[in-house]
Structure formats: structure tokens, C-alpha cells
Amino acid sequence: MIARSPAPDLDVPALPASATLRGAADRFGDATVLHQAGHELSFRGLLERASAFAHALHADGVGRGDVVALHLPNCPQYAIAYWGTLLAGATVTPANPLLAPDDLGAQLADAGAVVVLSWEAALPAVLAARPATSLKRVLVTGAHGDPEQPGPEVTGLGAYLDGRPSTPPGTDLEVDPDRDLAHLAYTGGTTGRSKGVRVTHRHVLTNALQAACWGTGARPDVTATGYGPGVVLADPGPVSEFPTPIGTGRAIGIAPWFHAMGTIGGLNVPLLTGTTTIVHARFDPRAYLADATRFAVTTLSGAPPVYAALLAHRETAGDLSSVRSLTSGAAPLPAEIIRALRDWLGEDLVISEGYGLTEVTMAATLGPAARSADRRPGTVGLPVAGTEIRISGPDGEELDAGAEGEVWIRGPQVTGGYHRRPAETAAAFDGDGWLHTGDVGVLDEDGYLRIVDRLKDMLLHKGYNVYPRDLEERLLALPGVTGAAVVGRPVGVDGEHPVAFLTTAPDVDEGTVRAAVDGLNERLLPYQRLREVHLIGAIPVSAAGKVLKRDLREQLPTPPPRAAKE
């Protein structure tokens, strides 16, 4: 079975991704696009500051085909540099500011970055990595602007922008949207060294429009602005179905902008929908809930660990009656968390889970956004416009609805493969346009996708498949368990034993938790039973909210404790 999108195909204009910024500056003008710690930046102000960055890059000889690295947390300076790089016709490579120098150097060298904008606290990693890179310019900024003494061969961002023109240079309009790269986006690296994904302007604009049109019922349009052609949304759906009109949305921005979810969902989509983003550089559940109340946010967004933390602090929340919808990505929301969110925020809350990968720019499926739509808990929704999903067997055969297999994706947002990795590109992207994701999923008869697990996470015990996500959902339903992750311990000819890492509420004692797990084991099939349980302070997650199972495997004690019997 191949599931196809119920949405009409989109007429994506042949324009650079930066046309979104032009359209937003013209349409929303002096309205606030970003708010952080009392400071605001308007849509027009973002265009003007980004234009100054583009002119500064041109003065350095940086333009089409060159790569600019952004090595800083979510902040207005990040957005300015991101859009400025695109206005210059250059390519952005986002880099996690917490990367170790060796990993940062590997990314900068692989991408061929010639300019990097770093955060003051993260600058030492850049300086340590610099000798192994092609960097010609190192820029720095911080929470309070430029540092007083940036250091030798380092330029403060404010000084770099001083005196630059505030109108777009226009060179971005010369790029080929189908060939020129907007992003060299590096994968999350949850299973090893990150790979650079080649994301064109067409991919970025397409996926941003797929998400924005899905959430508003609108269609793309091109408008003439004083800055050049701009892309906007037209003919949105009725307020009775899409209760947040264009230009009225407010959201907390915590998804890291150096990750696909943040780059597209946090930097691009809000410019189409006219959403004000309250920027948080890091996730703090109390601060998140305080700002959600203060700014009367209309939507909550995050990943499952975010919602687990918000639920644990719900007693600190104020009035959240303004919240109309909730979006989640990075991993499937456990059923227990969905039930708790509805109990807290109301049964009419629109909960929309999505599924995607860096290799598809961001999103492949989204839960229906219209109020009256059929939402199916436990699924990650339907294919977005122009997208197909199929489930394939071990030999590439197409499987029927209800059968578990590898998820394949085909659509206009599927990227061009990995940078300088032809063998890995050929293995993941086939000649018919399908991306082989490495995820295990199931399609139902109506095309709703359910993600079962990662193929790499699946355990094999005595010939049986054991899916960690299934065990994790069962563990999260136990009293007092606030976090759960299951990994495998190799045990020779038997394959792997399932091992659980748990976090618990502060008032729950270890004996109670272990007794609950023993009770769960009695209800499981023999090959599913958890052989070890380790209570830890926190489940390690990536910046995108994905559990770092390799870190947990490294924590497995050696030798293993005596395992439970089957």
C-alpha cells in the first residue's frame, strides 16, 4: 500500500527560500516576530538586519556557493544571520553550540565553511577547531551583544553590521532554487558521526509551505513587495476549523534552530503564518509555562520529553485557556502523555504529531490540523501535500496496510542526499525517488502512519523482534515512572536482553518502582521481559529531544547483574 496526501498539491513558486522573509516583512511589517528577554524584533526589522548581514558577507567576498556556519543557541542574532546568509545567496550550515571541538571541526571542515558566527561561551570550541577548517572569518555575539574584547582574529557581530545597507542586495534572486543549497544540515548524530544533508532552496520553501498550508488551510501566493517578490499565504481555511488566524499566533520557541525541526518549524513557518515567537535559548519547564501564560500563547510545541517535563510542573502553570493546539515531533508521544495533556488542557485541544527527518528537510507527515478532522492517537498523521508513504519488506517489497516494515518516503521535500558520501546516499535514496528511512512503521487503511521504532533500536532476542518503544510506553504507564528508555545488552547466541533505564517522581521509592516492573514483566511475553532496571537522574536526550540510546548503552554495568528468568 502507498499512502498519498489528502491535501492538494502545492504550486511552489520558483523562488529562493528568502522570498518568505520578503513576503513577511511586507505583510506583517512592524508586528513582532521575535521576543526574547524583553527585547523585540519586528518582521521588517528582521529583514533590515538580515540585509545588513548579507551586505557584510558580500564585502568579505562570500556569496553563492559559500558556506556560513551558525554556532549559537536560539536568539535574534541567529535569525538575523540565517536569513542574511540566504539573502547573500550563500548556504547555511547550522551547528550545535555544545559540540565538542573535534566534532565541530569535523562538521566545519566537511561543510567547507568560510565564515562562522559563534556564541561567546562557545567560542573556545571554534578557536580550537579552526586550524583544521577553511574558516576565513570568525564572528561572535552573546546574550548582551558583542563581547568587549572578542579576541585576535575575531569580530563582534555588531561591529560587522555597522554601516551596512538595510535593503536586500538582491543576489539571492540569482540562485537556482532547484540546485543551489540553502542548508547543509547535519543529522542529529544519535547513532554516530553526523552526516551533511544537501537541502536546496526548493526543498526549504516547499517544506515550509507544506507545513504552513497544512496548519492554516491556506495556499501559497506570490506578492510584489518593495523588496522584491515575496511568498505569502492566501485563502486560509475558516476560523471555525483553523482557530488561529494568520498573523495572530503566539508560540514559545524551544526547538533548536540548528535542528531541522527548528530551522523549518521555528525560522521559516512562522514567517508565513505571521506568528510571534517567544525565544527560549534552553528549555526550562517553569520558564516555559510562565511565558505561555504571560504571552497567552496559542500553541505549544515540543518533543515528548518536553511534555513530560511540563506535566511534571503543571501545578506552576497559570491560565492556559489561550492554547488551542499542540504539536509534537522527534519521537512518538506515548499514549499516557496524550491522555494527561487532554486532562490538563481540555478535551478539545488539537494535538498534532508529526514525523520527519533531516533527509526530508523536516516534515513528511502531520496530524490533521482542522478542528473537525479525524485524529488518531498513536499515529503521526497523514502525508503532507505531494508526499507518498509506503511500507516495505526486507527485500523492498510493498507491504499491505497493517503490516510492519520500513517506512519509505517520496515527495518534493526529499533532499538530494548526503554531502560527500555517495555510498551512503545510494543506500538511502533510491533511483525511484524513495528515501529508505530506517524506521519501522505501519499504515492503516486510511493512510495514517504509526511509527513502531527505529530499525537500529529494534532488539532481536532468540529470533523474536523486541520493540523498545512498546516497552517504554508500558513503563511510562506505571505509577511514579516519569521517564523510560529501553536498550539491548548483547548476550551471545540469544541476541540481546531488554534493559530499562527509568526516572521516577521524587516521592517514589525504588522498591515500589521495582515491584511495579516485576508486575509488568509477568504480563509480558518471555522474550519481551526486562532483564535489568536502572534508576537514573535523567534520560539523556539530544538537542532535538531524541533519546541518546548510545549514551545509555555506555552506562550498562559490566559484568551485567543477574538477569531475570524467562
Regions picked out by a protein language model, each given a short descriptive name:
Residues 166-186, 193, 243-250:
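Conserved pre-ATP/AMP-binding loop-to-beta segment of ANL
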Residues 99, 106, 116-119, 411, ...:
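AMP-binding/adenylate-forming catalytic core of the ANL superfamily
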Residues 382-386, 394-428, 448, 464-466:
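Conserved ATP/PPi-binding loop(s) of AMP-dependent carboxylate-activating enzymes
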Residues 272-275, 289, 294-302, 311, ...:
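Gly/Ser/Thr-rich phosphate-binding loop
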Residues 13, 32-75, 100-105:
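Conserved AMP-binding/adenylate-forming core of the ANL superfamily
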